[in-house]
Amino acid sequence: MLFRSPELIPNFADEFADGVRPRLTVALLNGDVALVGVSGEFFSNHSIRLKERARVKQLFFFGYCNGYHQYFPTIEAVAEGGYGADNAVSPAAVGAGEQIMNSALIWIYQMLGKIK
């Protein structure tokens, strides 16, 4: 059972009043090493899938960069439920993590010259 603390709600109400606006930072070093930073706690499958799709020698994925926007569960995790996938602790829209990973992938491919 997920523990809920109503007294914590005011702490997040102001922060997320205009919705969740996560930050994404992507850098590519020598065409071999991708650095991806996001402002939140992303479920590990996001980074695993990104690494498989990016096709660079090394990909380093960092959470908690330039802010913190709670949890970004995978769509599958939301469907399964459980800690971190409940909207009480994950105010991001379902699929937001996948959208951010797609943006990161596009940026990596642009830096590699594969997409203009």
Task: Place the predicted regions along the sequence by residue.
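Non-catalytic substrate/cofactor recognition surfaces at enzyme active-site rims
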Residues: 1-116
